[in-house]
Amino acid sequence: MLRRVNFYSICIAFGLSVLLILAGSRYADNTYRPSMESGRNVRTFLKVEDGEENFVAPIPSNSYDSVPSVEKIIEKTRSKIKFELSKYNFSDSGAHELEELLMESGGQPIQSLIISTWRSGTTFLGEVLNAIPGTFYHYEPLLKHGIVQIRGPPESTKALRTIKSMLKCNFVGMSDYFEYGMTHFHQFSHNTRLWDHCKFNKELCYDYDFTSRFCKLFPFQTMKVVRVRLRLVQDLLDDKELNLKVLLLIRDPRGVMQSRQHRTFCQPSADCWQSELLCADMISDYVAAGRLLSAYPNRVMVLRYEELALDPNATTHRILKFLRLSATQSLDEFLKLHTNVEVAGVSSTFRVSRDVPFKWKNVLDFNYVDEIQTVCKDAMSLWGYRMAHNATHMKSAEFIPLDNYTITE
């Protein structure tokens, strides 16, 4: 009997020891990576694209006995960026050293702005650029505007002011932005390098002074916006304080509308649910692209989502060349991981890319497709998307929706 008691006592003691070791390793300063925060965790990328459905992960509370000071975070981040980019090829950017691209050193970062609309592949493209070390990712700064397209004043004035301020790392006076983020955490969580410090102190994400200082540490900035049309960005391109390039991402309206069917946020909004408004914006963007490509050579790029999905590696390197960025190992790993596996979730960026762009052919009813094509005929012709003639033609393997296109002024 005594031996049995001793045996059970030893088992219990051993079990408690294992639990303590595991707990200690999980919360050690240099290893703590909660599953919903890890930048490389699969679930990180199963996010609501634009946050119209609440992101389920709250900002984590501090699990440490003490909170790192702002100065410690700034210094640690500065050192980390230097280490991660110690072998980076800056020659593509025209810079000789890292400091030339840092605002805190008086330099100009390389800045990119992705312009598109809902469900057009911006989440994937944004994550591609965010995979490059030293990138500060401004995710959807206009979330607070709701499910609307901003096509002109007065909303465009406020929207462009917000975009300019963020690209200049000046978050002063942006109380609306921070207040929205207090209840919509995805506004911050996509910016993985900022979010990584919110787990220590959630107030950091709402601190304009910290966010401004933190932003100025980074040599690369990328921003994605799905609520502003291309013709409005001329004001940004004219701003001499910015080192900005603009990338317009277009997608087949049939694929866009098929993808939007899965989003409950979309249906109440005419801007999101009416294909005629989507295609009117596509025509507007086509006209603006012709004008801006002529006026700002080498600063505007046009890309169809299907090209990125069908050949992500080659297309990504075209984008990098346009942005004057160099490929990195982390970017190559991201592309390999995110384009060769399928993970469930309508906002997942883990997809077998070649299967995504033409999914609409097999899941949409032809009558609905025909309705889209009727109101989108001109937009589809301009952007090089072929028409489906009937249900049999639409579903056939021989029907390739992509055609050539040319942008003219």
What does each model-identified segment do?
Residues S9, W195, F200-K202, D209-R351, ...:
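PAPS-dependent sulfotransferase catalytic domain
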Residues G121-T122, I319:
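Conserved G/P- and acidic residue-centered "switch" motifs that form tight phosphate/ATP-binding loops
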